[in-house]
C-alpha cells in the first residue's frame, strides 16, 4: 500500500511545489489511484489556478470550520483511470489571516486525516514552514519531501528548512530539486531531480507517457510513496524503479 500522505514543502517561494504536487497526483491517477491535493500555501493560493470554474468553499473555509472538506474539492480534468480532487486556497486576506490560527491548523489537520481515509493518497502543497497551517501539514504527513529550485538561493535555503523541520519533529525524508535544465551543476543533496516545466506546458504532463518528464515523475512518485504503479512508457516498456 505504501505511504498515504505526502507533503511537498517548498524551501523557497517559487520552487515549483504546486506543479510538482499536481503532477505527482496525476501520476498516481494514471496508475488508477484516487488522490486529493490540499493547498496549505494559503498566502500564494497557487493550487486555485488549476481549478476550472468558480471556487466557492476552499481550504481556508475548511480550516475555519465554515465548510466541510467535501464542499472544497474540485475535480482536475484527466485522461486517467484514477481521479484527482483539488482542495485549493482561494480567499480574501482577512479570511487567510484567520485561517492561520493554531485552532484552524488543527481543523485542517483533521480534514487531511479525513481525506486520507477516503482517498488512496493525499498530497499536500506546503510553503516554507513559517505558519501554523504549514506546521500542521508537515506533521500530519507520513512522508515529507523538501522542494528546492536549482539555484544558489535554493541551495542556501535548503539547510534552513531541513533544520526547521527537525525542530518541529517532522524531519525531511527526501529532497527534490526542480527546474533542472542540464546546464548547471546538480544539487548534491537531491534524491530526485525534475526538469524545468514551463508555465505554458500542458497540465498535467504526467498522464502523457510520451513526455520526457513523465517517467521521471513516475520514478520519484514510486520512491517517495513506496509503491509500484506498473506504468508503461513508449521507450522503456514496463516501468520499474
Question: Can you say where each PLM-predicted feature lies in the sequence?
Answer:
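Conserved catalytic-core segment of NTP-binding enzymes
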Residues: 113-202
